[in-house]
A protein has these predicted regions:
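Transmembrane alpha-helix signature in integral membrane proteins
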Residues: 9, 16-17, 21, 89-120, ...
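Hydrophobic alpha-helical transmembrane segments of membrane transport/permease proteins
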Residues: 16-65, 156, 160-173
Length: 313
C-alpha cells in the first residue's frame, strides 16, 4: 500500500504542477486590466510601473518560479480587483467553509436516499418500483441540470417563502441548493447500486447463500450490498469534492457567498491573481479526493493489494 501511495502522491504532485502552471501561463495571455482596479484612469507609465512591481515583466519561466516559490510558503498574492490588496489565502479561507458545508449536506442527502433507492430497485427488478425509480433517474440525467435547477429555484423559493438573497442563519435557505446539488450523485448511486445488484444476483456466492436458506433480504444486505460498497466508497470522496467544486452555478443562482460564486465573480472581473489561487485550491481538492478514495477502499476491503495491481498495469 505505501509504495502505491508514494507513486500516486508523486504523480498527483506532477499533475497539480502541470494544471496550475498551464492556467498561470494562459492568464498571462489575457489583458493586463486584471491586475489593476482603476486601469482606465492609469497612464501607460503607471501601468508599466505596476507590472514591474508585480514581476509581470519578467520572463515567463522566472514568473512561474516565483509563483511556486511563494505558493509553497503559503503566499498566493493579493487580490487586485475583488478586494483590493486583500491576501488571496484570506479570501479563500472565508469562502471555503460554506461550500464545504453545502457539499457535506448534499453528499449525505444523496447517500441517504440514493442507496436505499438502488437497493429497492435492484430487489424489485422489472416491477413498478424499479420502473418508477429508473424513470426518475433517467429524467434527472437526461434533462440539463440548469433547467431543473431553475425550476427548483422558481417554484421552491415561492413554496418555502424565502427570498433570492441567501441567508446562512435561516435553514430554509439551505434546503433548495442542497437538494439541487445532491440530485446528480443521488441518481448515480441509485442506478449504480441497482445495476450491481442485478448483475450479482446470479453469481455463485449468491446461489450458495440461497441454497443455505438465507433470505433475499439477507443476501441483498449482507452479501451483495457489502461487495457493492467497496467500489462505491472509492467514489464518495471524489464525488464530495466534485460537488464542492461543481457548485459554481448553484452558488451563483442562490447568491451563496462560497467558492463557486467567487470563481464566477473573479473570472468576470478579470482578477487573475484570485483565479490562480482558486484553480490551485480546486486542483488540490480533486487530487486529495482521488487518493482518499483509494485509501478508503483498502480500509474497507484489506484483500485489495494496490502493489500487485500497480505492477500488472
Amino acid at each position: 500500500m505505501m509504495p502505491y501511495l508514494a507513486k500516486r502522491i508523486g504523480r498527483s504532485i506532477l499533475t497539480l504542477f502541470i494544471i496550475v502552471t498551464l492556467v498561470f501561463c494562459l492568464l498571462r495571455l489575457m489583458p493586463v486590466e486584471g491586475y489593476f482596479a482603476n486601469y482606465e484612469k492609469m497612464t501607460e507609465a503607471q501601468i508599466q510601473a505596476g507590472l514591474q512591481s508585480m514581476g509581470l515583466l519578467d520572463p515567463l519561466p522566472v514568473q512561474i518560479g516565483h509563483f511556486w516559490r511563494d505558493a509553497l510558503h503559503g503566499d498566493l498574492g493579493v487580490s487586485h480587483i475583488y478586494k483590493l490588496n486583500a491576501p488571496v489565502t484570506k479570501i479563500l479561507a472565508q469562502k471555503l467553509p460554506i461550500s464545504i458545508e453545502m457539499g457535506v449536506l448534499a453528499m449525505l442527502l444523496s447517500l441517504i436516499f440514493g442507496i436505499p433507492l438502488g437497493l429497492v430497485m435492484g430487489r424489485c427488478k422489472g416491477r413498478w418500483p424499479d420502473k418508477l425509480g429508473t424513470a426518475v433517474i433517467v429524467l434527472i440525467q437526461a434533462v440539463p441540470a440548469a433547467v431543473y435547477f431553475l425550476y427548483i429555484q422558481m417554484y421552491g423559493t415561492t413554496a418555502m417563502g424565502v427570498g433570492l438573497l441567501f441567508d446562512a442563519a435561516d435553514w430554509r435557505y439551505w434546503v433548495l441548493p442542497v437538494c439541487s446539488m445532491s440530485l446528480a450523485n443521488l441518481a448515480f448511486y441509485a442506478m449504480w447500486l441497482r445495476r450491481y445488484m442485478v448483475d450479482e444476483s446470479n453469481k455463485d456466492y449468491v446461489k450458495l447463500a440461497r441454497a443455505k436458506g438465507v433470505s433475499e433480504s439477507g443476501i441483498a444486505l449482507h452479501h451483495v450490498f457489502r461487495n457493492a460498497m467497496v467500489p462505491l466508497v472509492q467514489y464518495i470522496p471524489s464525488a464530495f469534492l466534485n460537488t464542492v467544486v461543481g457548485s459554481i452555478y448553484i452558488e451563483s443562482l442562490y447568491s451563496i457567498p462560497g467558492m463557486g460564486g467567487l470563481l464566477v465573480t473573479c473570472v468576470q472581473r478579470h482578477d487573475n491573481t484570485m483565479v490562480q489561487g482558486i484553480v490551485l485550491l480546486y486542483a488540490c481538492v480533486g487530487i486529495i479526493g482521488l487518493i482518499l478514495g483509494d485509501v478508503l477502499m483498502v480500509l474497507i476491503d484489506p484483500r485489495i493489494n494496490f502493489g500487485k495491481k500497480e505492477g500488472g498495469r
